């Protein structure tokens, strides 16, 4: 699914576990990755064979990475608790809307 964040187009796609491990140079094959975010190519990859509830939580997590990469250019900034709360409050509606659209789109294609 394609979506925009701060006028940048991103893609969410579901992939096999070996693709996630390859992206992390981890060939242990123990099913350790549920998702990852690639800011350089503006893609979020989700492990396709996890339960919907886990996939949803993973997508929220990865979208927070996306939000941080897109809106907050930082490098090793130490956030205060108030900074974290502001980031969470400001990103909440954006991220929840994308997750809702993603799973509504997924449900349309179920047989």
What are these regions (language model features)?
Residues 57-69:
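Active-site recognition of the HExxH zinc-binding catalytic motif
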Residues 1-54, 70-111:
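Metalloprotease/metallohydrolase-associated module, dominated by Zn2+-dependent proteases
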